[in-house]
Amino acid sequence: MFSIINPSDDFWTKDKYIMLTIKGPVEWEAEIPGISTDFFCKFSNVPVPHFRDMHSPGAPDIKWITACTKMIDVILNYWNNKTAVPTPAKWYAQAENKAGRPSLTLLIALDGIPTATIGKHTTEIRGVLIKDFFDGNAPKIDDWCTYAKTKKNGGGTQVFSLSYIPFALLQIIRPQFQWAWTNINELGDVCDEIHRKHIISHFNKKPNVKLMLFPKDGTNRISLKSKFLGTIEWLSDLGIVTEDAWIRRDVRSYMQLLTLTHGDVLIHRALSISKKRIRATRKAIDFIAHIDTDFEIYENPVYQLFCLQSFDPILAGTILYQWLSHRRGKKNTVSFIGPPGCGKSMLTGAILENIPLHGILHGSLNTKNLRAYGQVLVLWWKDISINFENFNIIKSLLGGQKIIFPINENDHVQIGPCPIIATSCVDIRSMVHSNIHKINLSQRVYNFTFDKVIPRNFPVIQKDDINQFLFWARNRSINCFIDYTVPKIL
């Protein structure tokens, strides 16, 4: 329904934009005399768009949102035909409430069109809207269709660059700021691209990060520092440890930090501290089993998977919930054993999606692949392979003990304690020959054997399915004393 800007386009493009503002009626019949009842058929049975803040207090009503989408079509059709632009114009739009009156703000790329002609085009746009949208009835609203000028009273046409959106409009926080910019996802991608360009240039210059927290330009240092610390707390509370996750969650706060001096370094610093804070103060379970919506457990794919593999879902859920909560003592590992296609990897991947700090270890344990797993909340040991040389370290790791592994004479890495998921096609106890070693593994592992391949039409397990299942299991926990193998229902 909306055109988009190509995410690969340079954010600092030479494209310039004009800004049109269209005021809407508070009372349609009173402020647009002569409007027919048929006119409102355009607005019936229209689904609510999936935009941000649509249901917040003060958001534009659906009638105005629908009117905006139709007016945008009329304006762009005129613009692309009458101005003879070589390609369809790039644009951004936003509907909002200003002082109780609905409003539409539209940025349209000039694409070489002389600014001196904008007044003429705006007059013609008014006429086209009256004819093609308002069915020939002119709104009785002062200055209902205007374009931005350099002065409040008069002046030339004000021209904007695309950076005006994130660096000015998105910085405004007000109750009526609703229905954020229509191409917000693409804008986030473009902002991410600038960020990557900035980070290269700034790291080449090796800036002094202290300038960002304690600027010399008169900025309130204490206020800026407290805001930065508040941002770190917000990131860690939500489990945000990557730039992509930050942009998806709140592009506005990301851009606010990016626009500061050396903001890209600040972003990296905030994410780095957020990771350390999460690792020091949170458990994996803190990011799971928080559900505020109703659901039917029998339709949950995790519940269905355990039933398919002949496990008691309550027992399985109890084990997983308490294991993620560090409440099973030395039993720090769950193993999902089974052939390809049995659902073990799909289940594990969905668990990890909920947890911001996680690692995946492939195959055997060695010094080359340890450094990346020093600060994780959950470790997935995929296709686990146990060798005799490192068995004591493996035993400690599976048992939830902190281990310090030497990398070289001057360096080491600390791993754990963190819950571990081990997946394999064979029972991990078959990888060792000593009965002592088998006993050690039995004391540290809950073993789920998946012996059935899931059907092709089996639903894909999503991260929310894990949340629902563990939330359900948390309220039905049972006492369980299991040596190694989780029993199946006969």
From Swiss-Prot:
Keyword Nucleotide-binding: yes
Alphabetic keyword roster: ATP-binding, DNA replication, DNA-binding, Host nucleus, Nucleotide-binding
One of the protein's GO biological processes: DNA replication
Gene Ontology CC, one term: host cell nucleus
One Gene Ontology molecular-function label: ATP binding
Coiled-coil annotated spans: none
Keyword Amino-acid biosynthesis belongs to the record: no
Annotated binding of ATP, by residue: 338-345
Domain PV NS1-Nuc: 1-210
Occurrences of domain SF3 helicase (ranges): 312-463
Alphabetical list of InterPro entries matching this protein: NS1-Nuc, P-loop_NTPase, Parvovirus_NS1_helicase, PV_NS1-NUC
Stored Pfam families: Parvo_NS1, Rep_N
Cysteine pairs bridged by disulfides in the record: none
Protein name as catalogued: Protein U94
Gene assigned in the entry: U94
